[in-house]
Regions:
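Conserved loop->alpha-helix
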Residues: 1-86
């Protein structure tokens, strides 16, 4: 199937506050809830199907475009729990 991949860098101040993504977890980008297909320490990738690409503003996003990102709170809690269990 055809889909689009978007990779986003997590800003340092957000990473420092414990905002993280987990693979198969969710993240909201510009108001669109998406599934994370790849998660790194400071970046994550989402795959967007053609319908979503065409019916949202993703078709207008270019490299370097600022977007609104809302992280899944469960990922933040899991990261915090892992920190305390060390």
């Amino acid at each position: 199937s055809i889909y689009y991949k978007f990779t986003y860098d997590v800003p340092d101040e957000m990473a420092a506050k414990g905002y993280v993504t987990v693979e198969k977890g969710s993240v909201t980008v510009n108001g669109v809830s998406l599934t994370v297909c790849n998660s790194e320490r400071r970046s994550f990738r989402v795959a967007i199907i053609p319908y979503t690409y065409e019916h949202t503003n993703f078709h207008a996003i270019e490299p370097g475009t600022e977007v609104n990102i809302e992280f899944d709170i469960i990922g933040k809690y899991l990261a915090r729990l892992a920190e305390f269990s060390r």
